[in-house]
Amino acid sequence: IGFDATLGYGGHTKAMLQCLQGKGHMYATDVDPEESAKTKKRLEEQGFGEDMLTIKLQNFCTIDEIAKEVGGFDFILADLGVSSMQIDNPKRGFSFKVDGPLDLRLNQQKGISAAERLDTIGREELAGMLYENSDEPYCEELAKAITDEIRRGHRVDTTTKLREIIEKTLDFLPEKEKKETVKKTCQRVFQALR
C-alpha cells in the first residue's frame, strides 16, 4: 500500500502503480479539485481505476487519519510545491509573467484569494509577511506601496497590477540591475503571498 501526498499530474502515482503491477493499492491526496479531477480521469483511461487508486481531495496533513483507515502504508512519496500546471494557468494567478486574477490558492473554493487578503492587511503585517515568508529585502518599501495603492481605492487584484507596483517601487535602481532585481522580487513577493 502506497501513499502519494501530492497527486498533481499523477506522474509519480502512475509510476508506483505500474511497479505494483495490480498487486497493491495507492492512496493519493491533493487540495486542487480541478487538477485532481483531470488526473483521476487520465489515470482511469490508462487502466488505473478505483480498484487500484483512491484519490482524496484533502491536504496531505491528514495522512495519519488515512493510515489508520487503511492500516498503514508501505511507502510514502511527497513531491511538495506548486506544480507547473498551476503556474502555467493564468486563471490561477500564480505567475507574475502573465495577467490573471491575483488568487494564489491551490483550491480556489477554500479560503480567500491573495487579492482579498491584501484588501484587509495592514502595512506592518504585510512587510512582516514579505520578510518572514521570503526574506524580501525591499519588504518595507513594497508594503507601503501596496497598502498605499489600496488605501487610494485601487484594488491590487491582478498579477499585472502587483507586478507593476513592484516595478514602480524599484524604479530607483540602476538600469543594469533593475530587470533582474524586479524579476527576483516578483518571485519572492508571490511566494510570500502564497
Give the ranges of each region predicted by the language model:
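S-adenosyl-L-methionine-dependent methyltransferase catalytic core, i.e., the SAM/SAH-binding region
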Residues: 1-194
